[in-house]
Curated annotation (Swiss-Prot):
This is Capsid protein. The record marks N536, G537 as: Cleavage. It comes from Nudaurelia capensis beta virus (isolate Pine emperor moth/South Africa) (NbetaV). SUPFAM superfamilies: Positive stranded ssRNA viruses (SSF88633). InterPro entries: Peptidase_N2 (IPR005313), Viral_coat (IPR029053). Pfam families: Peptidase_A21 (PF03566). Residues 24-34 have a biased composition (Basic residues). One of its GO terms (cellular component) is T=4 icosahedral viral capsid.
Length: 612
């Protein structure tokens, strides 16, 4: 071999010689990146300029399609801040995490401007007749029927019974309640915190404190406060406030579309009908008898019914006196009133017509006649039409609720510590409720007769929202020492009336956002009617709503795409909350097991010491 020839050692890895070349190629590719000139970000809001965005060091590599700006734009929320805020308010109405009232308007573009507000309150329901200083632990239980009402001035209604033989409020209890409600004109006894009593049935309605001193609309429905309104969200949270020793109880919860109707009271049915009624007691001695005839405030001589007690008494004297309570007598002097008496078979024994003068008139009957029924028929030339809000009582029996909707949910109250019921909107379009619909609200049941319904002279004065459901929570098996508390949050959107003090607070409404409306609708379709109490108290529902909104990509624009995306996001958020709940249970179980183990070790140590 030639000594001048040098042999290089063989390379074990051919790629080692290309290492420097590869590094140089990478540096060249990086240098070939295109630099973007500095740009100025657009104006984000009126009167505010965003900071200039310096993209001098931003590079776009060839062959790459995942541009950071595009990716961020695709993953941003598809809704405006006002739309997102309304979704939070609608799906989580009792959450204390958002308090801005201007963000509570419905983004449907239905009205150009409006004002909005919020009603808040906390009330408790105590077993009727229970002394607040006592705590009975005798094992007695009571049912409580809670209605989450879509009324503007009264959000809650409580009904209960003191009959120990009834597990829940029965149909007979509801009939007694409806009859008393429809004929009640003085609501002092039936307004929180007072219970109105009808036999063994008790009920009370919870008013909105903010509207206590606000004058109601006139008889023509003209309001000095607003022309129309609509609820934007409403929710009630029940806190199961029960002693530890007797903390049993079950709640069955559902929501129903209100079967309601705003109608004119038909005077043809009422005015020309002879009213029959109640027990007449023979007062004192002598030939005279007195019947006091009460006429309610609504009976402005125009034909509303005058309910009288059923007459049952002995032989009538020859003359008697019919006395009207002049304080409530509202028909004009000079109108004719017809009085009739009948025998038990129903034959007419006498009929008298006289003219109302000073409120007292004397009528004469046949000697020895037995009065069976007494009636009054008002003869009028002018009839007073009255607006009423007729509404049917929804299913309240636990079995009926289960049959009426598969989304009925049941809670064991000592486990859930209560419940959280956001009220759902069942209408596809959020309509406005006119102030002219203000009038008596009267309940009806499948057993209510036409005669009894049209003879009613009372009813709670209010308006019924056109969109939201009526929530029903049948709580049963609770100890009589249980005092559940209820928190109510309600938001509304209204068009102020001329000269209204709410007028200066009106502002423009957000633009229509179909994505936000679809998100809210899809959520309510997939979720139950109520949640455990911790979904409000611990913010679990707020976290689910926020996570769902954050996961909806901007590029999903069609309604079908939004619905599918929301479904996936809700399932993901639900699984997250469920996993958190599972981990919490595992941690509690681990703590219990650890405590048992420590106790066992201590016990073994003590036994060892004793043996020594």
């Amino acid at each position: 071999m030639d000594a001048n020839v040098q042999i290089r050692p063989a390379r074990n890895n051919p790629s080692q010689g290309n290492q420097g070349r590869n590094n140089n190629n990478k540096r060249r590719r990086r240098r070939r990146g295109l630099k973007l000139p500095p740009v100025v970000a657009p104006i984000t809001s009126p009167g505010q300029m965003a900071e200039p965005a310096n993209h001098a060091n931003t590079r776009v590599n060839r062959g790459r399609t995942r541009v950071r700006g595009l990716r961020q734009a695709m993953m941003e929320s598809p809704m405006a801040a006002t739309s997102e805020a309304w979704i939070h308010d609608y799906l989580d109405p009792d959450g204390e995490y958002k308090t801005s009232l201007d963000d509570g308007k419905i983004p449907d573009g239905a009205i150009p401007q409006s004002t909005c507000g919020q009603f808040r309150g906390t009330v408790g329901a105590r077993y009727p007749g229970l002394n607040s200083t006592t705590l009975p632990l005798d094992g007695g239980t009571w049912p409580l029927l809670v209605m989450h009402l879509p009324f503007f001035r009264h959000p809650l209604l409580f009904i209960t019974t003191t009959s120990n033989t009834e597990v829940e409020v029965t149909n007979a209890d509801l009939d007694a309640f409806a009859n008393d409600w429809n004929n009640r004109t003085d609501w002092t006894e039936a307004t929180y915190p007072s219970w109105a009593q009808v036999g063994n049935v008790f009920y009370m309605v919870v008013p909105t404190e903010a509207l206590t001193d606000v004058p109601p609309p006139t008889q023509l429905g003209v309001s000095g406060l607003l022309e129309s309104y609509r609820l934007t969200s409403s929710g009630v949270t029940a806190y199961f406030n029960a002693p530890t020793l007797v903390n049993q109880g079950v709640a069955v919860i559902a929501q129903f579309q209100p079967d309601k109707e705003h109608q004119k009271e038909n005077p043809d049915i009422v005015a020309g009908t002879t009213q029959t009624g109640g027990t007449l007691q023979l007062g004192g001695s002598g030939p005279n008898y007195t019947l006091t005839m009460t006429i309610g405030d609504q009976v402005e001589f125009g034909g509303a019914a005058i309910p009288l007690p059923t007459v049952s008494m002995g032989p009538m004297p020859e003359s008697g006196q019919l006395v009207f309570q002049t304080a409530n007598l509202t028909f004009d002097v000079g109108n004719t009133i017809t009085i009739t008496t009948t025998l038990p078979p129903g034959s007419v024994t006498g009929m008298w017509q006289f003219t109302a003068s000073n409120g007292t008139d004397t009528v004469t009957v046949d000697a020895g006649a037995r009065l069976y029924a007494f009636g009054a028929n008002l003869d009028a030339s002018e009839l007073n039409l009255q607006d009423i809000n007729s509404i049917k009582i929804p299913p309240t029996n636990m079995n009926q609720m289960m049959q009426a909707t598969p989304k009925t949910i049941q809670f064991q109250l000592n486990e859930t510590k209560g419940f959280y019921m956001p009220l759902r909107a069942f209408q596809p379009v959020f309509e406005m409720t006119m102030a002219t619909s203000y009038g008596p609200v009267r309940w009806k049941t499948p057993r209510t007769t036409v005669v009894d319904y049209h003879r009613a002279i009372g009813g709670l004065q209010d308006t019924i929202d056109s969109n939201f459901a009526i929530g029903v929570a049948a709580m049963t098996g609770m100890s009589t020492s249980t005092v559940p508390y209820f928190k109510v949050f309600r938001r509304f959107e209204a068009i102020p009336a001329e000269g209204s003090p709410w007028g200066p607070f009106a502002s423009a409404t957000p633009p229509k956002d179909d994505v936000a409306l679809t998100v809210a609708r899809t959520w309510t379709d997939l979720h139950p009617f109520a949640y455990p109490e911790r979904y409000n108290g611990f913010g679990a529902l707020f976290a689910m709503v926020a996570k769902t909104i954050a996961q909806i990509p901007r590029y999903v624009r069609s309604a079908a795409g939004v619905a599918n995306a929301v479904t996936d996001c809700i399932e993901s958020a639900t699984e997250s909350v469920a996993s958190n709940s599972t981990s919490e249970r595992r941690q509690r179980r681990a703590r219990r097991v650890g405590g048992i183990a420590r106790g066992a070790r201590n016990l073994v140590g003590r036994i060892g010491n004793l043996s020594l």
